[in-house]
Amino acid sequence: MEKRDELYAGKAKSVYTTDDEDMLIMLFRDDTSAFDGKKKEALARKGAVNNQFNAAIMEKLKAAGIPCHFEKTLSATESLVKKLDMIPVECVVRNIAAGSICRRLGVEEGLELTPPTFEFFLKDDDLGDPMVNDFHIRSFGWASDDQVAQMKTLTFAVNDVLKQLFLDGGMLLVDYKLEFGMFKGEVLLGDEFSPDGCRLWDKDSREKLDKDRFRQGLGGVVEAYEEVGKRLGMTFEY
């Protein structure tokens, strides 16, 4: 697979075209950011950890019948993925209250949410990724009703798989965000699943093992990511 031009550079990943028009190479960088890019830092090993963590999770999801853009890892920091026409919203499921929902609704962090909540957010850093609903998505033509329904179904299917996976590793899946896109008429899970895009707590101590360590200046960010992987039986190459 020949790596060609850089197509896009985000806050923590770069995407490149290849000699196959249906495939892209996704490079996970060590760059880390929070608060819509206002806080930034490069953390050694993070790109490699997130790439390999994402690969392991995507394989678990594919095995559970969830369609994903992930194809295979190419190196410690690169993966081959299908080229999706991305739907410009994030799907967020919350099993436990933390982060923005606590500020918006005045609820205490740690409140168990039964059933889990589901929210859509528009992907737009300049606007602060505002929360939107099905009607916004329909009115602005971001996705069809059928695509919205599929995104919801797949997002909760991911929850069923990963809640138990992390629980088996002694962790609570607090919340997470997913992105989807279209590939030849099919809705596929895109982007990544790593501790950058979810909240994970130790089941007993409730120690934070995710990007909140960076947001809140707790330190040990990559070490926490590695600990999560270790609990799930992952090994990392650098």
UniProtKB/Swiss-Prot annotation:
It catalyses: 5-amino-1-(5-phospho-D-ribosyl)imidazole-4-carboxylate + L-aspartate + ATP = (2S)-2-[5-amino-1-(5-phospho-beta-D-ribosyl)imidazole-4-carboxamido]succinate + ADP + phosphate + 2 H(+). Pathway: Purine metabolism; IMP biosynthesis via de novo pathway; 5-amino-1-(5-phospho-D-ribosyl)imidazole-4-carboxamide from 5-amino-1-(5-phospho-D-ribosyl)imidazole-4-carboxylate: step 1/2. One of its GO terms (molecular function) is phosphoribosylaminoimidazolesuccinocarboxamide synthase activity. The keyword Glycosyltransferase does not apply. Keywords: ATP-binding, Ligase, Nucleotide-binding, Purine biosynthesis. Its EC number is 6.3.2.6. It is an enzyme of class 6 (ligase). One of its GO terms (cellular component) is cytosol. Pfam families: SAICAR_synt. GO terms for biological process: 'de novo' IMP biosynthetic process; cobalamin biosynthetic process. Belongs to the SAICAR synthetase family. This is Phosphoribosylaminoimidazole-succinocarboxamide synthase. It comes from Alcanivorax borkumensis (strain ATCC 700651 / DSM 11573 / NCIMB 13689 / SK2).
